[in-house]
Amino acid sequence: MNGVIIGRFMPPHRGHQYLVEFAHNFVDDLYVLVCTLSAEPIPGELRYRWMQELFPRDHIIHITEEIPEASRGAPNAEQIWAQSVREAVQEPIHHVFASETYGSPLAEALGATFVPVDPAREIFPVSASLIRQDPYTHWSYIPEPVRPYFTRRVAVVTGSEALRPAPRLLAKHFDTVFVNDYRRFLRA
């Protein structure tokens, strides 16, 4: 049996990981379509690479074709998406996995069974848009390979002894690492 997941994964998060892992354990072959547009804030090629790194056992397919007539709510959008999915996968599709409402009509258009996975987001109460709005509040939902994209580096340059603890305190506050005062190494 084959399964399909489609999404933007902008960025991938723990909810996406749960969805993919659930689907992976449900089918023999899983196809994950990473659908990207050139104008999106996180580059599509980067999201595609993240998904490949996160799910090396699955078939990760990058869809870059812009299909404006298939936007949500557009007439026949499911049929248009179903055709794109068939072209990308080229294998029989038995199951469509999603946590969002588009999954059911897409599955119907593909002649597949819809498997809703955590549609109320009770297991992982997060969305990619929430992460884009405030990544640090939702840091625990961002997978390790994705975190560097949101990581900001700060350099504290001072001659003041009073500010020596600042890097350590900043690191503690932002739950990250810091480099100790480099002057100690220069004096050695």
Q: How should these model regions be labeled?
A:
Residues 1-154:
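Nucleotidyltransferase catalytic core that binds NTPs
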Residues 168-188:
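Conserved substrate/cofactor phosphate-moiety recognition/catalytic segment
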Residues 154-172:
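Glycine-rich phosphate-binding P-loop
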